[in-house]
């Protein structure tokens, strides 16, 4: 069974541990990086549109198969050049991140979040930039309690509340 197709270069994907939804960071070719989303109960066979689309823009290829599922978020290469997919934060140590999808850009080192709603229509592209730059973010990880980790420039970092980082 093919669960999803029409992806150019999916660079990290995850399932929301609470809802079971699929999140994919898909690296673009020329100018757009995208975040793709598939709700748990929507079934297999999603066509994310590559090579007919890059992000929400027509790319010139031919759309094969079913209808195109556009990304829930995208950004241009003026903000970075290679998305690194992350996780929906379900931990307890950083309350402001609860229920938000956290992802990054490899080239700029920027980390962003966006709200993960209770349904596909509830996903919001209200992307907020976290006030941190880590360098080349290559991957995220999720601990058994839902806490997030990020790998950048050969180091493993753990997400904690700002006061905890200063005090600890």
Language-model segments: residues:
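Beta-propeller domain segments
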Residues: 1-127, 157-167
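Conserved blade-ending motifs and adjacent loop-strand segments that build the rim/top face
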Residues: 7, 121-144
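Blade-level signature of beta-propeller repeat domains, shared across WD40, Kelch, NHL, RCC1
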Residues: 138-167
């Amino acid at each position: 069974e093919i669960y999803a197709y029409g992806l150019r270069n999916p660079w990290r994907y995850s399932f929301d541990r609470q809802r079971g939804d699929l999140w994919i960071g898909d690296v673009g070719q020329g100018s757009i990086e995208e975040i793709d989303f598939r709700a748990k109960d929507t079934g297999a066979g999603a066509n994310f549109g590559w090579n007919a689309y890059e992000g929400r823009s027509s790319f010139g290829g031919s759309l094969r198969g079913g209808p195109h599922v556009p990304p829930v978020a995208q950004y241009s290469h003026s903000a970075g050049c290679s998305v690194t997919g992350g996780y929906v934060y379900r931990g307890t140590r950083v309350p402001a991140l609860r229920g938000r999808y956290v992802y990054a850009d490899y080239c700029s080192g920027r980390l962003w979040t966006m709200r993960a709603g209770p349904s596909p229509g509830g996903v919001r592209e209200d992307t907020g930039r976290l006030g941190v730059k880590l360098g080349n973010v290559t991957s995220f990880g999720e601990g058994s309690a839902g806490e997030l980790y990020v790998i950048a420039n050969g180091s493993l970092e753990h997400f904690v509340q700002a006061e905890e980082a200063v005090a600890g």
